[in-house]
Amino acid sequence: MPRDLSRSRSPSPSPSRRRKHSRSPVRQRHSRRSRRDRSPSPYSSHSYSRRKSRSISPRRHRSRSVTPKRRSPTPKRYKRQKSRSSTPSPAKRSPAATLESAKNRNGEKLKREEEERKRRQREAELKLIEEETVKRVEEAIRKKVEESLQSEKIKMEILTLLEEGRKRLNEEVAAQLEEEKEASLIEAKEKEEREQQEKEERERIAEENLKRVEEAQRKEAMERQRKEEERYRELEELQRQKEEAMRRKKAEEEEERLKQMKLLGKNKSRPKLSFALSSK
């Protein structure tokens, strides 16, 4: 906004002052066109179409009439304008008419710039007014809230709400603690049951292992006893066979002795017989 105000206070250059610096209508026209190209205004398209429709050909002929022996500073632009224009060129204008039309265009441009400046200034003022209004409304609301908070009734209501909130919070905490206690008791009971089951399982496994060990020992003892009994029977059989052999041997020896005794007894009886015979 200060930039717009300074722009509005600064005096605008007069057409006569601009004409003093311009050397020819052709160069003045090109300089204005270059300024319009650098900073286009909201109305540039409309004004350019109007200027294009009515003043392309006259400017071309006018530039030839004013400076016939001087080459234009921008010949390419004239070539483009020449290629665009398809209508026959109207009658030539005088330099005074050209200056008058330039003055009118400058006046329109200044008028548009002034309107644009006023519009921006109004927008800036409206924005400032809106911001100031928002600040005042916020300040009024803040003061109203502070006044309401300072009243005794509001204080009591706030204290009541705080007390209710504290009570509700205590109840929620107590309920949560009770739930956690019950959950911990249930967990401890489940843990005890699991430990008891694990203990019983371990005892059962130990008892089964003991039974298997005892069974293995019993089987081993029975097998050992069976082997000992077999060995004992074998020893008895060997003893019996040995005794039987000894009895047979003894019987054979007795029989042999008897045979010898018989033989000896026969031998003793023969000489007596022979002697008896001889004594006769």
From Swiss-Prot:
Q: Where is the composition biased (Basic residues)?
A: 16-36, 48-83
Domain of life the protein comes from: Eukaryota
Show the ranges annotated as biased composition (Basic and acidic residues): 102-124, 182-259
Pfam families, sorted: ARGLU (PF15346)
The record ties this protein, via InterPro entries, to:
ARGLU1 (IPR033371)
What are the start and end residues of every segment in region (Disordered)? 1-124, 177-280
Can you say what this protein is called?
Uncharacterized protein At1g10890
Q: Which organism is it from?
A: Arabidopsis thaliana (Mouse-ear cress)
